[in-house]
Amino acid sequence: MGSGASAEDKELAKRSKELEKKLQEDADKEAKTVKLLLLGAGESGKSTIVKQMKIIHQDGYSPEECLEYKAIIYGNVLQSILAIIRAMPTLGIDYAEVSCVDNGRQLNNLADSIEEGTMPPELVEVIRKLWKDGGVQACFDRAAEYQLNDSASYYLNQLDRITAPDYLPNEQDVLRSRVKTTGIIETKFSVKDLNFRMFDVGGQRSERKKWIHCFEGVTCIIFCAALSAYDMVLVEDDEVNRMHESLHLFNSICNHKFFAATSIVLFLNKKDLFEEKIKKVHLSICFPEYDGNNSYEDAGNYIKSQFLDLNMRKDVKEIYSHMTCATDTQNVKFVFDAVTDIIIKENLKDCGLF
């Protein structure tokens, strides 16, 4: 009888040990899991960062996956040229070539009749003629005064390549494609022995109420703000400057009680577009009090200080910031490595090892 009880005890002890081991494994896994929230106003580059994670930390895009973006890219091209020609009357701009009046009409007719995501030869020809027109180019130069995709000139300048019969989108084409994020998109990948769960949340105002249940147990927030948006207005509200909206949103996040213990990293994104724009448009259009040099460095540092000065807990909470170009894989790789090191350092600090 005694030996029976002993065997039972041994079995219980064995099970208990297995359970302890399992709990320890789960705890170790949990400790190595980083929950990363990508936040920011609409069109600040969050989804492009997610695509870069696939390129850098997963296996990138297979030819089959690249092909799936073809229809999206064609849709972006059509939306872009339509946005430009529809803005011309509002801005009081005429076509330089009289023949383009007919081309504009033809474009509108074709846009209504073609299958979405396709690019028939007659449409390509009309877009090519319109894009060459001086009036269309003048309207494109004033893109901040209406809503236009950042990738418009990238695609329209390469119309022949992307409309060739054997066209297969490359990684840069995929990175520059634009689809509005609705809901929450999760991406999983591993870096430096850490398991990342990255959540990309729609940035438009209507999407933001979906963020709240993502807040639980967040390790790090990457907040994306578009540097180049300083002279632009929101898609949802043409009375609100995009940079002001971004600052307002950052203020509510960096000082939120939910994020008292969360690392916050600021990505001042679209530095390439900002570098071009700042040569032509003074920063005082957004910040009337700014009287510094209208150089990339000075204006960029001023914007950075506007964000960082919003942090009410500077004495205990450091906010890390980086100038980024989300379409530049090497830049994103370098910056994300730095972010990973910050997360490791903060984790060690929490454990009292730093």
Swiss-Prot record:
Mg(2+) binds at S47, T181. GO terms for molecular function: G protein-coupled receptor binding; G-protein beta/gamma-subunit complex binding; GTP binding; GTPase activity; metal ion binding. Its main location: other. Retinal rod outer segment. Residues 7-27 have a biased composition (Basic and acidic residues). A lipid is attached at G2 (N-myristoyl glycine). Residues 324-329 are annotated as: G5 motif. Gene3D superfamilies: GI Alpha 1, domain 2-like (1.10.400.10), P-loop containing nucleotide triphosphate hydrolases (3.40.50.300). Residues 32-354 form the G-alpha domain. GTP binds at residues 40-47, 175-181, 200-204, 269-272, 326. It is found in: Cell projection, Cilium, Photoreceptor outer segment; Photoreceptor inner segment. Residues 265-272 are annotated as: G4 motif. GO terms for biological process: adenylate cyclase-modulating G protein-coupled receptor signaling pathway; background adaptation; cell morphogenesis; cone retinal bipolar cell differentiation; detection of chemical stimulus involved in sensory perception of bitter taste; detection of light stimulus involved in visual perception; dopamine metabolic process; gene expression. One of its GO terms (cellular component) is heterotrimeric G-protein complex. Residues 196-205 are annotated as: G3 motif. Residues 1-27 are annotated as: Disordered. G proteins are composed of 3 units; alpha, beta and gamma. The alpha chain contains the guanine nucleotide binding site. Guanine nucleotide-binding proteins (G proteins) are involved as modulators or transducers in various transmembrane signaling systems. Transducin is an amplifier and one of the transducers of a visual impulse that performs the coupling between rhodopsin and cGMP-phosphodiesterase. PANTHER family: GTP-BINDING PROTEIN ALPHA SUBUNIT (PTHR10218), GUANINE NUCLEOTIDE-BINDING PROTEIN G(T) SUBUNIT ALPHA-2 (PTHR10218:SF68). Belongs to the G-alpha family. G(i/o/t/z) subfamily. This is Guanine nucleotide-binding protein G(t) subunit alpha-2. It comes from Bos taurus (Bovine). The lineage of its organism: Eukaryota, Metazoa, Chordata, Craniata, Vertebrata.
